Amino acid sequence: MLIIFLFFNFCYGFNEPLNVVSHLNHDWFLFGDSRSDCNHINNLKIKNYGYLDIHPSLCNNGKISSSAGDSIFKSYHFTRFYNYTGEGDQIIFYEGVNFNPHHRFKCFFNGSNDVWIFNKVRFYRALYSNMALFRYLTFVDILYNFSFSIKANICNSNILSLNNPIFISTNYSKDVYFTLSGCSLYLVPLCLFKSNFSQYYYNMDTGFAYGYSNFVSSDLDCTYISLKPGSYKIFSTGFVLSIPTKALCFNKSKQFVPVQVVDSRWNNLRASDTSLSDACQLPYCYFRNSSGNYVGKYDINHGDNGFTSILSGLLYNVSCISYYGSFLYDNFTSIWPRFSFGNCPTSAYIKLNCFYDPLPIILQGILLFLALLFIVFLLFLVYHG
């Protein structure tokens, strides 16, 4: 029987990498949207778990922070807000689709959604790289030494309103300070309009801004800075101060563990982007994707078989997670587990040219088994004299 096992192991391989997101133990957490929002099922006209891309048995395990219609990027920048909060050693992200080219957001009528897609890439790159080093994620408000009675109403559309950052005139009489305390690290936006000249008229009653800028960038260009706790002063050489109001809070440092990201996209009938794959880079991130179009069972954008298969890895532990996929065992594999963590295969097996008939192997196994029985019988006779 051992020969039969070795035959199939070496010639066919029992430990190929699986295209799933999974975990080594029960210390994991998932951040998602409607495709993993079990609470949203109760809001449907017909309570149908086919709406989800995760298995319903995961709904009450306390390891998922998801909200239909939301994303971490959207909650970070806009008034539409969900407080994504969770903790785990192995972090999985399956969200992001709720801000993409389909929404066509831009700050101005003649602005550019492309600038915002670049912002999205930079945001998720910073999020993923930081979460490889921390267990805990949540949102926090940034508090100031005074309230802003006058602020510019910039970057609004019929679907979203920007509230992080907000903008005030640099002629404001008070110095602007903020303090960060309570978290190990903060992700804070620094957004500006790249311009050589700007002039605005502020409505003192409504705070609405009318104006002109000689833009180099046609929209709001953001970078995302990881700041340690401390007191900060904001100053600018421009005409407008960009004031951050929210930050991502990272807490409870851990040994480096790459995050796992599942592509978040629509059916091909809607425009999607490649922001998540662009942001998810080695060594801090593993990217998982389905090879086909997203075609849901509940509707075309919910319940796709390919992505359900990828998320099915959350139902069980694996031995090893790597760039190529997850491994169930730590023995042999045909694909070396590059950039891996966990108990991973120690060597790649040599794939032999196994073209011979397996029947002789089976007969050898039977003969080996009979030989073992005969030896046991002889030992029995010797023992009983």
From Swiss-Prot:
Residues 383-385 are intravirion. GO terms for cellular component: host cell plasma membrane; membrane; viral envelope; virion membrane. It is found in: Virion membrane; Host cell membrane. N-glycosylated in the host RER. It is a single-pass type I membrane protein. The keyword Hydrolase applies. InterPro entries: Capsid_hemagglutn, HEMA, Hemagglutn-estrase_core, Hemagglutn-estrase_hemagglutn. Residues 12-361 are virion surface. Residues 240-352 are annotated as: Esterase domain 2. Residues 1-121 are annotated as: Esterase domain 1. The chain crosses the membrane at residues 362-382. Keywords: Disulfide bond, Glycoprotein, Hemagglutinin, Host cell membrane, Host membrane, Hydrolase, Membrane, Signal, Transmembrane, Transmembrane helix, Viral envelope protein, Virion. Disulfide bonds join 38-59, 107-155, 183-249, 191-222, 280-285, 320-344. One of its GO terms (biological process) is fusion of virus membrane with host plasma membrane. Belongs to the influenza type C/coronaviruses hemagglutinin-esterase family. Structural protein that makes short spikes at the surface of the virus. Contains receptor binding and receptor-destroying activities. Mediates de-O-acetylation of N-acetyl-4-O-acetylneuraminic acid, which is probably the receptor determinant recognized by the virus on the surface of erythrocytes and susceptible cells. This receptor-destroying activity is important for virus release as it probably helps preventing self-aggregation and ensures the efficient spread of the progeny virus from cell to cell. Isolate N2 belongs to genotype B. Homodimer; disulfide-linked. Forms a complex with the M protein in the pre-Golgi. Associates then with S-M complex to form a ternary complex S-M-HE. This is Hemagglutinin-esterase.
